[in-house]
Structure formats: structure tokens, C-alpha cells
UniProtKB/Swiss-Prot annotation:
Locations listed in the record: Cytoplasm
UniProt main location, coarse: cytoplasm
CDD domains hit by this protein: EF1_alpha (cd01883), EF1_alpha_II (cd03693), EF1_alpha_III (cd03705)
NCBIfam families tied to this protein: EF-1_alpha, PRK12317.1, small_GTP
Protein name: Elongation factor 1-alpha
Family: Belongs to the TRAFAC class translation factor GTPase superfamily. Classic translation factor GTPase family. EF-Tu/EF-1A subfamily.
Organism of provenance: Methanothrix thermoacetophila (strain DSM 6194 / JCM 14653 / NBRC 101360 / PT)
Gene: tuf
């Protein structure tokens, strides 16, 4: 069975309309993950709406509303197999207001494909997504320079090199090692260099997207870290009881384990664990599971709670120290500012009580102690007090629960990681 292959979560990131969904659709289509008759149906539907070129992207779109608008909304979990891995696609939509989806999506990703349209080059969201991917700990990256069929002239090597240079500069700035990142000229729509090398880019001798995916390193599963499962949803299933759903970030969950949910502070015994509607005896990092806990009611826990073992419970912060980088803010950030922190599945308003130091974003060394304010482009060490209880861990101890994004005014203001926690 395919599941004996190692599993990777793959995010597709990049600016809106640069072709992320089309590339995913093309990939799934080429890898035989979609039936021919479904593609045919999509082709007809798209043509009827006057969106003939949307056929592959439609594979990713499951919501009626999205189709009418012609954009991808929710994070779609799709899967396809290569000869080496099986991938779950965490499709990260590109529209501005969907960045917070990306925050929850990208933090689940082992690797990302950055899609940049050759005619446009680097755009605002290209920068934002690269930045977030880096901050959220996505260390493996593949760059697909897409829409090569739309350059002047088509499949122009010069334009490819210009965009490659521009993207390379951006990646270096946030700390990716450029020599480890493959850059691939593609046309997702026509299939050039996605699975097979294209005759239209004879000047390119590097890997296809498929080659690059197979060359990714298998992530080490953090099984030895304490158990942490952020709750995404809670269901009440008749005959079973309360079933929280979430992704195991660290540790191992076994049937019969005594677990506690924080900050709800309720505990119970694990009766059963399910993955894709199949019961399993234990769950490992990366598994998206539903688990039933004896003695816990549907209203006892909610999204944003974190499940851990009773003898090593998740840390509830009274306050914490963090390192952040300000992505964008219309004015300046000073002590007393209370935006919303998105950490794992929790969204909690937190007050920045003190700006301890301003850092050089490239090196991390201190530029200024106790600055009065910080603004776009600055990196800083801050003290934070959540307005209500929330779980956050030191990034050095449990990185998966130590990273966060800060949002306000419908945009991502900053991204950061927790360095120290004062437990409640």
C-alpha cells in the first residue's frame, strides 16, 4: 500500500494568480491522482463559464462560491504519490485576506513549492509568503518559475534568469541557502518541466518539479518530544462521544493514554484514535487524527486547546518573550499594542508589554536596547502578555508550538518565535 512510503506535507505558496492551483492540479493529473472523466467534466464547466484555462486549477476548487469568483479559498488537503513519497498538498491560497490560512497551513508543511509567474516576477505576496515560510520553519523550498509560455518571446531564457535572480535575492535575504534551492522554468498549464523535461526549454538542464520533489529530504519525525496535538475542531459523534480533531505535531499518542487539554484544563483517557476513518492503535507526528477521550464533553474543549500527556502537559503562558520581525505596519508598534497572535490553532489577543531590544534582522545581533517603537522591516525581542490563557512553547524545546504570526487590520503584521515562557 502507498502508505508505506514516507509522507510529506507540501505547501504551494506565492502571489495570487501566479498558478499555484494549476500547478497542483497538473501535478495530480500527471501522477494519476485524478480521473480523466473528472478533468473532462471540469473542462466543460470551465468553458461554460468562459474560464477555459482554469481546468487544472478547478481540480483544487471544491467550493461553489470559489468557482463563481474564480479563486481558491480554503486550504485543500489533496494527495498524490511519486515513486518515492506520498504527498499531502496543503494548498496555500494567495489572496491577501487568506494569509492567516497560510499561517495555519504552512506551519504544517515539511516543504514548499514557491510559484512565481515569469511575466510578473516577485510581487508583494511572494515576499510575504517566503517570509512566513521561513519563519514558520519550512526549510526545504522548490522554486517554480511558472507561465513560461507567457513570456516575450515564449519560454525566454533571459526572462527566466532575471526572475531567478530576483527570487534568489529575496530568498537569501530571509536566510535560505540558495545553492540548495532548485529553480525550475515551468508552464503548469502546458505541463512543461512539471513531470517531463520540455523541448521548449532546451536551454534548461536542471530537474523537473517531480525530480525536485523526489529529491526532498525526509523530515525526521519528532517522536521523542512531548506529545502535543493542537485541536482544530471538536465533534460530538453519537455512539462515540466527544471527538477532537487535529494534527499530531510532536510525540506519540496511544490508546489508553491519560491526556490533558490546556488551557481548558480537562483530562481523560484515550478510548480510540482514527485516521481517515480507520481506527489505529497509535498516532505519530504528521498524522491528522480524530481521537475520543473518555470523560470529556463537547463543550469542555475548543479549537486552540492543545492535548498533551498528563505527566507533561502543554505550557500555558502567563507571559512570554519572543523574537519577531515586523512584516508590515502602517505606523509604528510600541508597548501596549494588542494585536491577535496566531499560534498553532489558537488565536488570542496579546499585549506587547515591552520592546526589549531592536535587532539586526540579518544577523540577530542587538542594534538598540529598549527602543520606544519598532516599524516595518525591524526585528525585535518583545515581552508579551496574552489577554486570556493560551498554550505556547519555547521554540528551542517544541518548535512546532513555538512559532506564531501576529495579525491586525486584516493583515499579517509580524511573525515570530517564542524564546521563553513564564507559565501560569
Amino acid at each position: 500500500m502507498a502508505d508505506t512510503k514516507p509522507h510529506l506535507n507540501l505547501a504551494f505558496i506565492g502571489h495570487v494568480d501566479h498558478g499555484k492551483s494549476t500547478l497542483v492540479g497538473r501535478m495530480m493529473y500527471e501522477m494519476g491522482a485524478i480521473d480523466e472523466h473528472i478533468i473532462e467534466q471540469y473542462r466543460k464547466e470551465a468553458a461554460a463559464k468562459g474560464k477555459a484555462t482554469f481546468e487544472f486549477a478547478w481540480v483544487m476548487d471544491s467550493l461553489k462560491e470559489e468557482r463563481e469568483r474564480g479563486v481558491t479559498i480554503d486550504i485543500a488537503h489533496q494527495r498524490f504519490d511519486t515513486d518515492k513519497y506520498y504527498f499531502t498538498v496543503v494548498d496555500c491560497p494567495g489572496h491577501r485576506d487568506f494569509v492567516k490560512n497560510m499561517i495555519t497551513g504552512a506551519s504544517q508543511a515539511d516543504a514548499a513549492v514557491l510559484v512565481v509567474a515569469a511575466p510578473d516576477g516577485v510581487m508583494a505576496q511572494t515576499k510575504e509568503h517566503v517570509f512566513l515560510a521561513r519563519t514558520l520553519g519550512v526549510n526545504q523550498l522548490i522554486v517554480a518559475i511558472n507561465k513560461m509560455d507567457a513570456t516575450e518571446p515564449p519560454y525566454d531564457e533571459k526572462r527566466y534568469n532575471e526572475v531567478k535572480e530576483e527570487v534568489g535575492k529575496l530568498l537569501r535575504m530571509v536566510g535560505y541557502k540558495i545553492d540548495e534551492v532548485p529553480f525550475i522554468p515551468v508552464s503548469a498549464y502546458n505541463g512543461d518541466n512539471v513531470v517531463k523535461h520540455s523541448d521548449r526549454t532546451k536551454w534548461y538542464t536542471g530537474p523537473t518539479v517531480l525530480d525536485a520533489l523526489n529529491a526532498l529530504k525526509e523530515p525526521q519525525k519528532p517522536v521523542n518530544l512531548p506529545l502535543r496535538i493542537p485541536v482544530q475542531d471538536v465533534y460530538s459523534i453519537s455512539g462515540v462521544g466527544t471527538v477532537p480533531v487535529g494534527r499530531v505535531e510532536t510525540g506519540v499518542l496511544k490508546k489508553g493514554d491519560k491526556v490533558i487539554f490546556e488551557p481548558a484544563h480537562v483530562s481523560g483517557e484515550v478510548k480510540s484514535i482514527e485516521i481517515h476513518h480507520q481506527e489505529i492503535p497509535e498516532a505519530y507526528p504528521g498524522d491528522n487524527i480524530g481521537w475520543n477521550v473518555r470523560g470529556i464533553g463537547k463543550n469542555d474543549i475548543r479549537r486552540g486547546d492543545v492535548c498533551g500527556h498528563v505527566d507533561n502537559p502543554p505550557t500555558v503562558a502567563k507571559e512570554f518573550t519572543a523574537q519577531i520581525v515586523v512584516l508590515q505596519h502602517p505606523s509604528a508598534i510600541s508597548a501596549g499594542y494588542t494585536p491577535v497572535f496566531h499560534c498553532h490553532t489558537a488565536q488570542v489577543a496579546c499585549t506587547i508589554t515591552e520592546i526589549k531590544a531592536k535587532l539586526d534582522p540579518r544577523t540577530g545581533s542587538v542594534k538598540e536596547q529598549n527602543p520606544a517603537f519598532i516599524k516595518t522591516g525591524d526585528a525585535a525581542i518583545i515581552s508579551v502578555r496574552p489577554t486570556k490563557p493560551m498554550v505556547i512553547e519555547k521554540v528551542k524545546e517544541i518548535p512546532q508550538l513555538g512559532r506564531f504570526a501576529i495579525r491586525d487590520m486584516g493583515m499579517t503584521i509580524a511573525a515570530g518565535m517564542c524564546q521563553n515562557v513564564t507559565p501560569r
